[in-house]
Amino acid sequence: MADKIMAVTGHRPEKVGGYSDEASKRLTTFAEEMLKFYKPEAVITGMALGWDQAVAQACINLKIPFLAYCPCKEQDRKWFPESREMYRYLIPFAKEVFYAVPGTYPGAWCMQVRNEMMVDDSDYLAALYDGSPGGTANCVAYAQQMGKEIKQLWDPWQWFLANRC
């Protein structure tokens, strides 16, 4: 099952196991399995904490090109030092880096601009989404509005946690 360009959206660490190294490794392992199953030619990630960065790391591990669609420059400016370090490690591996808006963080709306760019430039969306409101929900809603196929990963993630960890 090979599809072309996959965009990803998903929750921050608080909803997918936390900030520990162990939680990050679990999420990255799940991302690797998801990528092996769907076999995208390339992946678009928004580079947010949690799922987005786990997918970027999985792409590096599997040698799948990824495009970093960042909401703005200095997206990481309010993050913990360890999170900034990871972001700055991942970015140079991106095939290309795009910024949704010029300049530094102008407000949360730039994340939705980024989400729309990701959906518009992809063939389908893979969403690690539990149904709660927020940025992931907004991205999924936009993909639905645009008629994009959405691969919902929350149930497979729950199965993975129960059976593989």
What does each of the following model-derived ranges do?
Residues 1-165:
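Acidic/glycine-enriched connector segments
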